[in-house]
């Protein structure tokens, strides 16, 4: 893949000298590479050419739109190659929160709350041509969580199994009443931070952005940063009404997504950090 990236850059950025190419890692949707310590090249893992091309083109157009109103920095594409499924942009400041936890995560709450609130206030008509709708009901989420639990149960302690089994035995929350524009994958791997200052410096990977339940964005803050930072984030959130039913769904999604990350991390080469991070957060997320 590195040779393919070199060839692609020679065609799309003529005159740009490629010195170093470093693989940064991969997630569920994409693999990322760093060029010369300054340029990020992200390659889609989608195997279907038509879907890969459409997704890459859509995300490039979406980033241009989001850049106009996001209160936090987002990638600005240098080029997109839909056929190859590649998007390139110069690095934003900061490093992924998943890899480098901050000393005082509470300091992240104002920026996260303001950011998520601004996304959720976006007029749906402004972005609906660029994103899909993602409305799997909570019952479908629980079915997915049950499958993931079946894959990972043997890796959990007895105490963790009791927590997860209790969760899966309860009735899922009611379906959401409202929809909003969501990043839809606002996990710690996609939040960039200044570790020394405990500050958010950007948000990356908009592949999964959709019109969806607003609780979906807040759910991953609960999963990755805990209930206290979640509550502080809500104190700075102005994206619309967010009541106890919304909170219940956010916690529900957080638990389902944690199980998904454990299953992914245990089954995918090079992705164990997803499992390790989620296992470390399991007790507090299911408490």
Where are these regions (language model features)?
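An alpha-helical support segment within catalytic cores of ATP-dependent transferases
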Residues: 1-17, 93, 109-110, 118-184, ...
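Short, surface-exposed alpha-helical segments at coil->helix boundaries
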Residues: 2-6, 60, 231
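ATP-binding pocket architecture of kinase catalytic cores
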Residues: 19-140, 153-154, 158, 176
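Active-site acidic catalytic loop and adjacent metal/ATP-binding pocket
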Residues: 25-35, 41, 77, 168-216
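Helix-rich C-terminal or lid/interface subdomains of diverse kinases
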Residues: 26, 97, 208-214, 219-287
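Short strand-connecting beta-turns/loops that link adjacent beta-strands
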Residues: 82-84, 195-198, 258
């Amino acid at each position: 893949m590195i040779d393919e990236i070199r060839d692609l850059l020679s065609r799309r950025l003529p005159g740009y000298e490629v010195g170093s190419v470093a693989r940064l890692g991969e997630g569920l949707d994409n693999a990322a590479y760093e060029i010369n310590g300054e340029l990020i090249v992200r390659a889609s893992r989608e195997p279907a050419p038509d879907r890969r091309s459409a997704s890459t083109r859509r995300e490039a157009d979406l980033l241009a739109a989001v850049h106009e109103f996001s209160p936090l920095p987002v990638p600005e594409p240098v080029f997109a190659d839909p056929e190859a499924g590649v998007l390139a942009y110069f690095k934003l400041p900061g490093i992924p929160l998943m890899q480098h936890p901050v000393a005082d995560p509470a300091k992240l709450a104002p920026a996260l709350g303001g950011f998520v609130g601004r996304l959720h206030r976006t007029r749906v008509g402004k972005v609906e041509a660029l994103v899909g709708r993602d409305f799997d009901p909570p019952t479908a989420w629980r079915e997915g969580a049950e499958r993931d639990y079946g894959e990972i149960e043997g890796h959990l302690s007895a105490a963790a199994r009791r927590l997860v089994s209790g969760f899966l035995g309860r009735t899922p929350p009611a379906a959401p009443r409202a929809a909003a524009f969501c990043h839809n994958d606002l996990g710690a791997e996609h939040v960039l931070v200044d570790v020394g200052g405990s500050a958010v410096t950007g948000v990356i990977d908009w592949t999964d952005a959709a019109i969806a339940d607003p609780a979906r964005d807040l759910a991953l803050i609960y999963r990755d940063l805990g209930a206290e930072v979640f509550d502080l984030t809500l104190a700075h959130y102005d994206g619309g009404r967010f009541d106890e039913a919304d909170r219940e769904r956010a916690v529900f999604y957080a638990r389902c997504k944690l199980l998904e990350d454990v299953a992914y991390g245990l089954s995918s080469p090079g992705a164990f950090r997803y499992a390790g991070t989620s296992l470390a957060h399991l007790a507090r997320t299911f408490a």
